[in-house]
Amino acid sequence: MMWQRAQGLREINDSQQEGGLLLCADALETDLSAYLGQVQMIYLDLPGATGQDYSCKLRVGEKGWETSRQAINLPAYSDYVKPDDQQYLHDLRRMLDLSHALLTDSGSLFLHVEANTLARARLLMDEVFGENNFKNQIIWTYQAGGRSKKHFSRKHDVILFYAKSTAHFFDITQVPVTRKEERSNHLKRHVDEHGRSYRSIKTGGKEYIYYDDEPVYPDDVWADVALLQQKDPQRTGYPGQKPQALMDRMLLSTTKPGDLVADLACGSGSLLMSAANNQRHFLGIDKSPVAFAVSRKRLAPYRLVCQAPFSDHGAMLDASSVPGIGYYTVGINSYIVPEEDLVGFETQPKGLPIRGLDLVDQWCAGLMNKGVFVAYASSVRQKQTPVLQTQLEVPLLRGTVSILLIDVLGRRTLWTATPVM
């Protein structure tokens, strides 16, 4: 049976695991007044100033997720033209002003910047947050990347860390790191009366003792967090994705369980995942429909409120809904997209035909009530689950059985078998 389109105000992903709010919107054009002074930590990794366009390499179908040999490139975002671009500086200043207003008095901001924008970003941060609230210029160094003969190869990123005020909350004991063994080479080793091993050194008339079992904490050079490798299960294909370990260190040191954190250009949703995994609430915003789709997929196991426009295109969905004992069994049979919709997209391999349910990246089944779609079950394609489930169960509750589907082009549609009253 062919289903028809429906419209909704928002989507709620029903789950027992606490999550947060995900918006497909421009943070600078969104009313966030309800969150003023409520956010404990903000992470920003904004478009840079290289003049480049970036695409998301999304795997397609069961074979694509199993072997990575089938994919489609989707436009993700574009950088500003150059570092002194007035639009870049204007938008960065507005984003910093918004972040300052959203933060609690004890809150923190981490701004991820590139080498060619660092100086200007630091000056703007000093203007908005105050020089006295500067905490660290964190160097995240890594070994991956290319080599250059025109200059020293760039092997680090910079993260500017600022507090909102002197009431700043910071707890480094939440982020211990592995002790560096090479530090002990020039120290004498001992064992105390309790059997604890330690090393010592005398200098300046004083003896310094370091117990082997004492925790150690990171400084402002982070060399122990690697870039995501090509086969890392975290990898989504979204450009610029950062590893969870990087997000965890910033989040755990500046927030407590139950706090609200935000990413106003959330991209692949790494900070949001860190928040959900560590019992923090999150607010994620990105104006890219592709970023929204990638983040939504990663956050599918968590309770999630989504607000994003629905696409209006010529696709058709063949689906079914069969009532049973306590549940509807909802199934998708086929999804048809006009061939012209796929024209112009680069695929791997070149000319890859994408048809049928290979066009579906994720879908969920649920009930519609008064414009609100509540998803009770979902299936998403990812490395761990390359095969799309074609049947899901929805409880026999009040509401109209509906399907929310996101295809491989990042287009989000809502469907129902009967008109929504």
What are these regions (language model features)?
Residues 31, 37-108, 172-201, 277:
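SAM-dependent methyltransferase catalytic-core segment centered on the flexible catalytic loop
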Residues 72-82, 225-236:
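Short glycine/proline-rich turn/loop motifs
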Residues 269-273:
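Glycine-rich SAM-binding Motif I of class I
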Residues 1-10, 19, 28, 36-40, ...:
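Accessory, often C-terminal, charged low-complexity segments
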Residues 110-111, 264, 284:
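Conserved SAM-binding loop
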Residues 258-265:
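Conserved class I S-adenosyl-L-methionine
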Residues 232-246:
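Conserved SAM-binding loop and adjacent beta-strand
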